[in-house]
Regions:
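Active-site neighborhoods and metal-handling regions in enzymes and metal-associated proteins
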Residues: 1-251
């Protein structure tokens, strides 16, 4: 069942999402050569807790970090640890915060120092594909209208969208209905209604869309070893234009 949030619930969600977005921004500022991914995770954890919230990911299904930090060919669910960032890496940071009963969820991929033109294009196309998708995140449209727009834009730029993992509803639970794929034909899936809150998150690979999960049962990498990027925001469906909730202004 798809949860429709009322205004009181949305007030809590907006705050959760502001905290989440600020934690993402903090992580992005830390991405530079010589920084350990565990350092970034600790900063994310400490910031979220300082705001009276809890890291949504910590302990979720046994996940050991407060954020997912995925470098280069790691698509999602990278476990923060001893890896020291190097010049030329691309670093995806996925963050969630739980505040007064509701979750925020967002992600972005950041360059570490100077990166290749191809890597920068991948980051840019991934981010823009999100904005292409939310043009269709409007009352009366269907979920797959978002999906189709993302896929069309990504593939027109020579990249592929991951199919094994998808976006999702978010609210009182970190993962709620409906699923929001980044691929598919338009005009399918549930109709969008005001009060729906969706984590729309293109995961885009430079090569094949296929992925594999490592022995730690979390780290998900591209099957061909090529780069991957990720961009995500929590989005509210309204009577008019969609509202991106994971923005940090005014915190």
């Amino acid at each position: 069942m798809i949860a429709i949030k009322n205004e009181k619930e949305l007030q809590c969600m907006r705050q959760a999402c502001k905290i989440t977005a600020a934690a993402r921004a903090l992580a992005g500022e830390m991405v530079r050569p010589g920084v350990c991914t565990k350092q970034i995770d600790k900063a994310v954890h400490d910031y979220i807790v300082s705001q009276g919230a809890k890291p949504s990911f910590l302990g979720y299904g046994g996940f050991p970090g407060s954020s997912c930090i995925s470098v280069n060919d790691t698509v999602i669910h990278g476990i923060p640890g001893g890896y020291v960032l190097q010049e030329g890496d691309i670093v995806s940071v996925d963050v969630g915060a739980y505040y007064k009963g509701f979750h925020g969820d967002c992600a972005a991929t950041y360059p570490c120092g100077s990166i290749s033109a191809d890597a920068q294009k991948l980051i840019d196309v991934t981010k823009q594909s999100f904005f292409e998708g939310i043009r269709f995140a409007k009352r009366g449209n269907r979920v797959s209208d978002i999906s189709h727009a993302i896929q069309t834009y990504v593939e027109s730029n020579g990249f592929s969208v991951v199919r094994s993992f998808v976006g999702h509803g978010v609210g009182a639970q970190l993962h709620e209905e409906p699923e929001v794929p980044n691929f598919g034909s338009p005009g399918r899936g549930p109709r969008l209604l005001p009060g729906m809150t969706l984590a729309i998150e293109p995961m885009v690979n430079a090569g094949t869309h296929e992925v594999r999960i490592l022995k730690d049962k979390w780290t998900t990498v591209t099957a061909d070893g090529k780069l991957s990027a990720h961009y995500e925001n929590t989005v509210l469906i309204t009577d008019g234009e969609p509202e991106i909730l994971t923005v940090a202004e005014g915190l």
